[in-house]
Amino acid sequence: MRNDELHCLPPARRRFSLRFLRHLPKLLLAFDALALFLACTATAGHTQAPAGHLAIYTIDVEGGQATLLVSPTKASLLVDTGWPGNNGRDADRIEAAMKDAGITKLDHVLITHFHVDHVGGAPNLVERVKVGEFLDHGENREDSDITRHDYAAYIKAIGNTPRRIVHPGDTIDIPGLTTMVLTADGEHIAAVPGVKPEPNPYCATEPHWDLDTTENPRSAGILVRFGKFRFLDLGDLTKAKEIPLVCPDNLIGHVDLYLVNHHGFNLSNSKAFVDAIHPRVAIMDNGAHKAGSPEAWQTVHESPGLEDLYMVHTAEDSDAAHNSPDPLIANLKGGADGAYFKVVASADGSFSVMNSRTGQTKEYAVR
């Protein structure tokens, strides 16, 4: 308001206008501070991935598997459901990861195979969370009472929820990601689109591995691509089924993030396989007294190009030489359980890993 306009106002109105103009800068500062406070309050207590990023949670289910992927558009895939019982502990931890990611339902749940530490949590999960579809490799193939029981419990739990049987070469529709099934029911993909098979020099010294008759070698495994970022999760695939993926030619190529096969058991993680995929970072979803075998740990630790090997638990049945440094372990011996790793990936291939126990994040720049 100009001075000549002020003189046209009645005296009382003119005094109010002058006071308002004198205090206007302070009012503007107050509004700015309020806006900043509201913005901070809205995000306090949440660590959702920034827009345009892929989030991957390696949830602590005590040596089982539950891995949550959330796309930039909040589409979701849960790989496996952890154990049954324990007062719904594993379903609680899955729900906590979902809350952190800002989602309330699961679009897809992939069951890699029908062992209790992977499929056992399904009944608890469906009681709490809406699931769009379940995916698995088909009928249980293992001749054991416990696995037959767990498979039957899974089929009963999913009820009328859509179920899709996946085969090598199938894709899982997650907008923004390319999610391809590499292995399922003992079969493997013949070629990965966009990957040129290369001869694998590590095959020459790899022993022959016998095939076991459990559900493990029938694991449904996936390769997830988000721009240049590549994540590999093959469930509990064992050595005899790892080798055809990389020998004589490497069909997979290199990966940025490797969820260590079979929780780090030495029945899996053959040297020719691990060295061929050349992981930049590996996460071992072992338990305190489950897996984390010294031989498997050493193979992954020594793989060419590896920068860090994270562990969900200290492997208490191993020795200090075959455990990662404490900052790379989510749950330490003698400490509280339930801590997890959260990976946030960008389409340019860069990513970070956050240890929820420490709150510390390590960045892995584009290379």
Question: What does each model-identified segment do?
Answer:
Residues 7, 11-12, 33-35, 135, ...:
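Compositionally biased, intrinsically disordered low-complexity regions
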Residues 2-3, 30, 324:
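Intrinsically disordered, low-complexity regulatory regions of eukaryotic regulatory proteins
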Residues 1-24:
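N-terminal secretory signal peptides that target proteins for export/translocation
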